[in-house]
From Swiss-Prot:
Active-site residues per Swiss-Prot or TrEMBL entry: Y105
The keyword Iron is assigned to this record: yes
Name of this protein: Probable ribonucleoside-diphosphate reductase small subunit 376L
Record GO biological process: deoxyribonucleotide biosynthetic process
UniProt keyword Cell division, yes or no: no
Enzyme class: oxidoreductase
Residues the entry annotates as binding Fe cation 1: D67, E98, H101
Membrane spanning residue stretches: none
Amino acid sequence: MSLLKGRNYYKPFTYPEFYNKWDKHEKSHWLPSEVPMHDDVNDWKNRLNDNQRDFLTNIFRFFTQGDVDVASAYYTQYLPFFKLPEVTMMMGGFAGREGVHIDAYSYLLETLGMPEATYKEFLMYEEMKDKQDYIKKFSDSRHILGKGEENLTTEDKEHIAAGIALFSGFTEGMQLFSTFAMLLIFPLNGFMKGMGQIVTWSIVDETQHTEGMIELFKVFVEENKTGDQPIRPSVLQETVYKIAKEMVGLEEAFIDLVFKKYKDEPINDDNDLETKDNKDFFGLTPQRLKAYIKYIADRRLNLMGYKSIFNLEPYPTNPLPELEIMINAPTHTNFFENRSTDYANVSTKGTWSEIWNKPQ
């Protein structure tokens, strides 16, 4: 068996597990137009203060672009190499859903009245541009394309595997979750509920994407540890660890940027990692958020079969336990309405307004 070999027929599947992931993912389709946003507009204009709007604006500047870059990775880094129908179906489904995310985040920005110039403003901030520049270093696979499986070198195979770790493990699986955490503190406290619904559904998607692609990573590495030009497990491990550390560092710089305006406030006391009563950010501190992304990065490493490298203290468990259920559960309790957000189309009947207002 080989993930890199194509097949001239649809069935039998070589890797039915990837078809199953596609099937589950496609039953969870959604569109941004299904999310009511009128309360968010009122919150933005009348309920949020200047600090909160400024905080969210800094996040929004890179929010859409982050998923544009992830979607591009599926088309340029993954699909050119993996030809089997069940694998391309899974990847194609994931890539298509990134398009939904891009449109949803854009829908949010435009509903709030933000100008189109917002989409390019991230280029003015070193901390945001550095995140994009880093992943672009891994985006050029022209030296591999067209070689054919039999001509791939050890370095080529390690490049493919490291790219999956970077894009799916630490971009989708860690950096996006950092953004989700910063955004979710608002709907968890009664603000921006439409934004919260978009983020909640995106979490479901990105969890499936991360888990599906990391499973592919493990199968690919296992298949290529022997034979001609084998992957060197110790070399790949060190590469993945290096990527994890560098991407966590980039995300920490972004977190510092988002909180920079408030650096003189007590929430940024480097000696205090615990929640403080901050009325603008509901107790979320840069320290807790940085601990959280390290916690998430370790979980992604564990899923790949590697040991944790951050080993957080004083947080041996999730530093943001209020988000635990939203990130790890397949069906989430909607904190904003206390209703299920399992949005599988096969189980949805009637209009969305009827669903939201249905008695429990």
